[in-house]
């Protein structure tokens, strides 16, 4: 199992932009081998994230015998599986915890100028979806697949003030405490 090392981790390969305004990042490439009678067959699995810079984000996995084909399959799947997350001034609405498998991710909104304080796969997600200020911590498993899924589960679970106001039958101002 080969992890992406050094300068290439989380970088976009040149020529990946399709002109549709989406940002693409490769999170991990895994080399796998299948042992057969005649020797070993190499294969590659790629994990990528795609975002529109305005709260839209998707993750994709691709497998192939060659790296570029695996990455392309992953990018295509990520485009198909995009979700929309409502942001508040370039950060989250409220603190949230996401879980998937043994991975647990804690994400908290941060004040302007903080930047993205998050590790590895989480950083790639926040960069492509347009989050500029956030504090995030990965607890438990740091497997990139599980961390990405846990992050997306947490982001999907986050609710905005309009949803909460509709549930409670109140106005958004009452929920935010702006009305006296």
From Swiss-Prot:
Region annotation Disordered: where it falls in the sequence: 1-20
Record's keyword annotation contains Magnesium:
no
Task: From the Swiss-Prot or TrEMBL record, give the protein name.
Answer: Small ribosomal subunit protein uS5
Question: Out of the domains of life, which is the source?
Answer: Bacteria
Q: How does it assemble?
A: Part of the 30S ribosomal subunit. Contacts proteins S4 and S8.
Query: GO biological process: any one?
Result: translation
Cellular component aspect of the GO annotation: small ribosomal subunit
List UniProt keywords, sorted A-Z: Ribonucleoprotein, Ribosomal protein, RNA-binding, rRNA-binding
- InterPro entries the UniProt entry points to: Ribosomal_Su5_D2-typ_SF (IPR020568), Ribosomal_uS5 (IPR000851), Ribosomal_uS5_bac-type (IPR005712), Ribosomal_uS5_C (IPR005324), Ribosomal_uS5_N (IPR013810), Ribosomal_uS5_N_CS (IPR018192), Ribsml_uS5_D2-typ_fold_subgr (IPR014721)
What is the protein's known function? With S4 and S12 plays an important role in translational accuracy.
Query: Its encoding gene is what?
Result: rpsE
Similarity comment: family membership:
Belongs to the universal ribosomal protein uS5 family.
Which Gene3D superfamilies does the record match to this protein?
3.30.160.20, 3.30.230.10
Q: What is known of its domains?
A: The N-terminal domain interacts with the head of the 30S subunit; the C-terminal domain interacts with the body and contacts protein S4. The interaction surface between S4 and S5 is involved in control of translational fidelity.
Q: Extract one GO molecular function annotation from the record.
A: rRNA binding
Q: Which residues form the S5 DRBM domain?
A: 22-85
